[in-house]
């Protein structure tokens, strides 16, 4: 177990000024509460996939994931990856983008998300996978070192296929706020992070179109990614 550290001083919870994307996530939180799921996951927790038939912010569609309603442009996202290269979400226009928020010390939810995204890319085949970009944003500015990230990506089969973005607590905190993501160090086990466990499906035109809980299946991504890329 890592030596306990003090939580970061920067705000780690979204505020009422979080912007357009925050309304998407807050709508989803209401839905998930209604159906008995959990949108804010602890590092050892889990979540049920929100029903796509619920209409309070999520609508039925041809997608297997939950369709955001109304769909909104993806908020800004520009950080360095663990290799020090600047990555901007806008550079992937024309591709489906699957965006999630992870950390390398996570004992269960994050490995599950990363591994299932890797399986989905494998099952798509090279042609379809080339039209998909997976992005993870760190929720652990202290623990997600370049060495830790490289090992995590290799361990879960997404090395070279997932852009893992890192930064200072201040840099990451701004992104969490913009995307309406909850992230905070656990009070009793500060090496763990309580965080939102969603995957955002973003269309080729840069629109946040679908949402997936941590319990998504690779088959859902295999089905939805080509639709996202072409929409």
Regions found by a protein language model. Name each.
Residues 49-56, 147, 162-170, 195-198:
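Periplasmic c-type cytochrome electron-transfer domains
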């Amino acid at each position: 177990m890592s030596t306990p550290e003090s939580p970061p001083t920067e705000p780690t919870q979204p505020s009422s000024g979080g912007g357009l994307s925050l309304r998407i996530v807050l709508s989803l939180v209401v839905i998930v509460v209604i159906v008995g799921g959990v949108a804010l996951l602890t590092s050892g927790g889990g979540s049920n996939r929100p029903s796509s038939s619920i209409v309070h912010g999520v609508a039925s569609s041809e997608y297997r994931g939950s369709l955001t309603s109304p769909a909104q442009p993806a908020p800004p996202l520009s950080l360095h990856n663990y290799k020090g290269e600047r990555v901007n979400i806008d550079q992937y226009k024309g591709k489906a983008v699957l965006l999630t928020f992870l950390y390398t010390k996570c004992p269960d939810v994050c490995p599950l998300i990363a591994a299932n995204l890797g399986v989905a890319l494998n099952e798509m085949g090279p042609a379809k996978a080339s039209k998909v970009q997976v992005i993870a944003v760190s929720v652990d500015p202290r623990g997600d070192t370049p060495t830790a990230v490289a090992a995590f990506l290799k361990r879960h089969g997404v090395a070279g296929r997932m852009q893992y973005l890192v930064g200072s607590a201040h840099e990451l905190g701004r992104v969490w706020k913009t995307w309406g993501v909850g992230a905070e160090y656990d009070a009793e086990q500060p090496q763990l992070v309580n965080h939102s466990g969603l995957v955002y499906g973003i269309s080729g035109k840069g629109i946040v179109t679908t949402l997936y809980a941590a319990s998504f299946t690779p088959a859902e991504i295999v089905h939805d990614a080509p639709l996202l890329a072409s929409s």
